[in-house]
Amino acid sequence: LHVRSRRQRQMCIRDRPVIGWLVAGAGTLFIERGQRHAVHAMGESMQARFKLGDAVGLFPEGTTSEGFDLRPFHASLFEPARSAAIEIQPVALRFLKNGERSGFAAFVGEETLVANLWKVMGSTGLSVEVVFLPALAAKHADGTLPTRLELSHQARDAIRAVL
């Protein structure tokens, strides 16, 4: 089984020189932050990708952080997978510097993307642990679909438990 992965990113990334072209070429789906209609459009794009057999990766916090705790998840981003009855695979990312959890590589605050990339590429001892957690069931035992809020809470709780 070959699954092409697509990721959801903010629209502002699309406009970045070089980076925008690279991520768009990889099949990234972009969302306009702060636009209510954007969630619906993103859902339609995700549904179309599911029909092609693609997996869609998303970052449901909707922003970046230092990675020591989770911000609330946007439950609406879970709706396309929920309505298509597709299992959701929570994945936790743990960033390490010299073997210890670290926020060093975080792209937060007033730091520019270029400054962050320069800092990360010029550093040593950085690594990322990718932890694949048990998939969330697409349906309850009685055949009903979980709500998007249930799915977002289950995913967040599973990820938080390993951070």
Annotated model-derived regions:
Residues D54-P60:
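Generic beta-sheet signal
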